[in-house]
Amino acid sequence: MAYYMTNGEFQAHMKDYYQRTGNRLQFPEMTEYLYNKGFLYDSIPAPDLTDDYDSMSDEEFEKVVDSLPLSLTLYDGAPLAPTVEEADLIPNARDVFVIRHPRYTRPNLHRHNYFEINYVSRGKGTFIF
């Protein structure tokens, strides 16, 4: 069964968990944590979309991205696979897919069976390759 939460809510929980515990979780681990705490929804939250993307400020665009729903499946507790499969992240029949990577995740050495491009739209980051 799929569960749901907005991108912004997921990120807020990642940040809160890190600030409270000093520990970073991987995406599947945080999904399990949120499920156990009762924070996930059974239905998809409606995104806050607008038609005027050409003249949006960065803050307005971030608000739209924060409102986008995530479809989450529960983590079974097994060791995280060393390969992130395309089917685990990219919807069927999509050649290009864009996500905002959540902050405060634990670095985890892995590989993909797809091509990934990282882009920092604001601030700075450290890319570990």
How would you describe each model-predicted region?
Residues 1-126:
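Generic protein-terminus/edge-of-domain signal
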Residues 129:
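Short acidic-glycine-tyrosine-enriched beta hairpin
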